[in-house]
Amino acid sequence: PTSWWENKVAGPSALLLYLGVRGKIDELDHHTLLYTKDWKSNFAEVFHAPDGNRKVPNPASLYICNPSKTDPSVAPPDHENIFVLVPTAAEPAIGQGGINRSGDEKLEAAADQVIAQIADWCGIPDLAERIVVRRTMGPADFAGELNAWSGTALGMAHTLGQSAFFRPKNMSSKVSNLYYAGHNLVPGIGLPMCLIGAELVYKRIVDDRSASAIAELKPIK
């Protein structure tokens, strides 16, 4: 029920940018992390901004992935395949993204700020004009497309009362044979944790009480 979520704390959401860029970008390695000097203020915008004042931080601490740096097959010849993740508050009102600037105006403006920041901080002055494909995704996309509570990208925050065995269990206490797996549950957020969560559901169903990983999937009867 909706009331169950009222006292829960959502983890961060994100502004995501998927960029196809003409020409090679020697300034970016496969992984690049950019941090603002005012760390405390930057992350306060992500975790503690009041309702009605939640937005994409500017400047922002962010992550850049340039997979074509090590695997040229993920981009056309003489192009780069760039992914950018900017942590934001879990607030759908921050906006919805789209393809080639078709998203909400304020979210696309925030994406422009991020691109300008990367260009400035990494020494790529012509980055914006070299972008040939652009897709953005914001908290409203997580809420609308993925049904993510509060538009979070990471599920329930790992506060003390929402960590480890304090997180929701993987089996319903009200509906027989209803099981759950995902980032809101035990053991936690992130793709590896979600896969482990699915493994724990399987082991519960087949009554496997071992501590080791599954060696072979067995039919569920």
Regions found by a protein language model. Give the residues of each.
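Acidic/polar loop patches that form or flank catalytic/metal-binding clefts of enzymes
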Residues: 26-32, 124-131, 210-216
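Flexible loop/turn segments at secondary-structure boundaries
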Residues: 25-27, 70-73, 90-93, 140-141, ...
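Core structural elements
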Residues: 66-68, 82, 87
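C-terminal structured subdomain/cap of oxidoreductase catalytic cores
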Residues: 1, 5-10, 14-26, 79, ...
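C-terminal structural cap/anchor segments
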Residues: 84, 98-135
